[in-house]
Amino acid sequence: MSMCLAILYFLSSQASAIMVGLSTEELTKASEVVIRGEVEDVEPHWSMDGKTIFTSASITVKDVIKGKISQKKIVVEYEGGEIGDIGVRVSDVSPLKKGENIILFLKSGESKRDKQNEKIHNIVGSAQGKYTIGTDGIARKSGFSIIKGQEAIDNDISVDPLCL
């Protein structure tokens, strides 16, 4: 009996890491804001309850593709990161790296830190909502597993038509 429960737990936790693929159109519709920017800094921190690690990334906004953002710098927060010898990796989350040029599909969120009233953004669709812009001008996304909808996903998109 306990072996069956262990197997069911394992299967359910594995299944939760697989998502349905989202097209660029679906990501755009689900997002309040879509931006092109550069990652200025990343800072891991403990959640308020001290049970998990989240990372806050400071992003300099270069272009607003959809929506309105009045500030030139925003904070994007996502689960995972490393503090000292402790690290948390989350399946289907593509960590942001300092100096990275990116396109992000975002929605407003609440910070997991103690800072009250800090306005943060979360990435829509986990890793699907992050494109890394290469030196060739192509924005690429990776780092996620999908159960269905592969045909809908645009893994590579040209940046120029987006930033008119």
Tell me what each language-model feature is.
Residues 2-4, 8-164:
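Transition segments tied to proteolytic processing and entry into folded domains
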